[in-house]
Amino acid sequence: MNYVATTCTQPVQVQELIKPYGGNLVNLTVNGEQHRELLEYANRLPSLQLSMRSLCDLELLSVGAFSPLDRFMSRADYQTVLEDMRLKDGTLFPVPITLPVTNRRSVQEGTDIALRSPKNELLAIMTVEEVFEWNAAQEARLVLGTTDVRHPLVAEMASWGGAYISGPLKVLNLPKHYDFSELRKTPAEVHARLQSLGYSNVVAFQTRNPIHRAHEELTKRASEQVNGALLIHPVVGMTKPGDVDHYTRVRAYRILVERYYDGSRTALSLLPLAMRMAGPREALWHAIIRRNYGVNHFIVGRDHAGPGNDSFGRPFYGPYDAQKLLQKCESEVGVKMIPFQEIVYLPDEDRFEEQHRVPVGVRVATLSGTEVRDRYLSNGKRLPEWFTRPETAAILSKITLPMHQRGFCVWFTGLSGAGKSTIAEILSV
C-alpha cells in the first residue's frame, strides 16, 4: 500500500485556536451585485449535474473545509496526491478531490459550465481549465490499497466515467438542506463558536454511528485530558452503506449534547462529508478537515474509516494503521492524534474504565454492534441504561418498528419544475 509513503515535517506552533490548514480559509462563495450578474449568466450556460458525492465535495470546497484546496484537483495535484499524498506545491493532502464526467466530449477546456445539484438546482460556475483521463484501478490501488469491489468506493468508481475536470469555481448557491439547519455550520462559524468557549485546545470526535455511554465517556475524558473544548462533528453526507440514517443519529446527538455534556466546553456541528472509507489516508484527511474548523486534537479509533472485510473475509486495513499514519504526520498537519481507548463498563462498581486498566478477574459488560441490532433492537427490547442513555435508546427503538408502523405515503402529481421533489424532501425530515 502507498498510504505511508511520505515524509512528514514542519512542526506547527499552536497559539489560541489553530489557523486553517495552509494559513487561510478558502471561501468560494459569490455575493452582492456580482452574484446577481452571474446568476443570469449561469442560466445561459451548458450544465453538469453533480452526483451526491460531488455535491458534498463542492459544498465543503466552497466553505473552506478542504483548505487550501480552492477547486477540484488539477491533473498535477491529482497525480502527486495519488503517489505521494501531497499537492504539487508539497502540501500534505492524502485524498484526491476530483470531479468526474461520464462524457468527456460534453465538456470543453476554456469554457464555462454551470454546476447543478441532482435536483437541477444551480450551484456554481466552473471555468474548465483541464479535462484529463484517469485510471480507476490505479486510483483505487494507491488511495484505497485495494481493487476489491467489496470496497464500496471501488464499486462506485466504476460508474464515474473516464475523465476528471478542473478549474476555478464561483459558487452562487450552497446546496439546500431542510434538516437540522441550525447545526450545519461552516468552518468559520464553528471556529467562532469554539473561540467563544475560551479554550486554545479543541478535540474533535468524528462519528457515523450513534453515541453510546462508552463514547460519551471517551469524549469527555479526551477534552479533560487536553484541557480544552470538545467538538462533536458527526458525518451526515455519504457514509458506509448500512449505517444508521443521519436523521435518527442527529436527533440522538442533539438531545445527548443538550442533557449530558457541559455546554461551556462542547459544540455540536454536522459535517456533510462524502466519506471514501479509505482507512489511514482518510484519517489523515479527516484531521486536516478538522483543523480548518479550529481543531488541534483528533480522536482516532481502531480501523478508522475502514469499510469492513474484503472478498476473502479479511479487514481492508490493519486495526491501528490509521492511528500510525496520523501520529507520523501530526506535527506537520498540526493536529495531535488521540487514540480511541476501548472503554468498558464495570457493573459491580457502576463505572466505566479503559480496558487495559481493568484488573484481571474484574467483571466487565460490553455489547457488540451485532448484539445491539439482533438481540435488542430487532426484538423490540430497550437497550440497557449502562450501555446508552435512555433518550438514545428511545430514538433508536423507532427505526426498527414493524413496516406497517413506519411513516406514510404522499402521492405527488404535477408538471416538471413545479416543486414536487422539494416538497418531498422537506416532508422526509
Q: For the regions a protein language model found, what residue spans apply to each?
A:
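Walker A (P-loop) phosphate-binding motif
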Residues: 404-429
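Active-site cores that bind ATP or allylic diphosphates and position pyrophosphate for catalysis
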Residues: 2-404
